[in-house]
């Protein structure tokens, strides 16, 4: 059975993430790798839920086989998660996949991530979960503005 890596901020997690995880789990055993608090602070200025909280929520989702933590995302890419995923699962005879959400295409993801996957024998998959239906940032902005 294939093993699938799915990365993201997941801050906060929402139904769009769950839908993408469900679709990714249909491809194989799903390993989810949430980004660090530091990565979120760089990208968005702050984080809403600390990593430990996000990990606990993700672990409880029925589609998730395991959660990958403590990977280096300081370069702004998922290459650290891809490397750790490969180190953990390369010995299996299973096909390794890197799932990208519905808002990701070969044209708007880091070429480093795609090249890194290919160099390790991991197949990148795009448009997992279909078109983006929600955004964590929009969700939080709407909440802030409703006050």
Question: Where would I find each of the regions flagged by the language model?
Answer:
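Nucleotidyltransferase catalytic core that binds NTPs
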Residues: 1-147
């Amino acid at each position: 059975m294939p093993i699938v890596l799915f990365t993201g901020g997941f801050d906060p997690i929402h139904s769009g993430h769950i839908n993408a995880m469900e679709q990714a789990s249909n491809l194989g055993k799903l390993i989810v790798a949430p980004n660090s608090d530091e990565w979120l602070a760089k990208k968005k200025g702050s984080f809403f839920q600390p990593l430990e909280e996000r990990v606990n929520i993700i672990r409880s989702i029925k589609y998730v086989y395991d959660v990958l933590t403590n990977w280096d995302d300081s370069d702004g890419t998922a290459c650290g998660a891809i490397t750790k995923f490969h180190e953990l699962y390369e010995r299996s005879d299973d096909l390794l996949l890197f799932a990208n959400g519905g808002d990701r295409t070969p044209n708007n993801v880091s070429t480093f991530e795609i090249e890194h996957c290919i160099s390790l024998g991991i197949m990148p998959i795009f448009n997992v979960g279909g078109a983006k239906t929600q955004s964590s940032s929009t969700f939080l902005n709407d909440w802030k503005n409703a006050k």
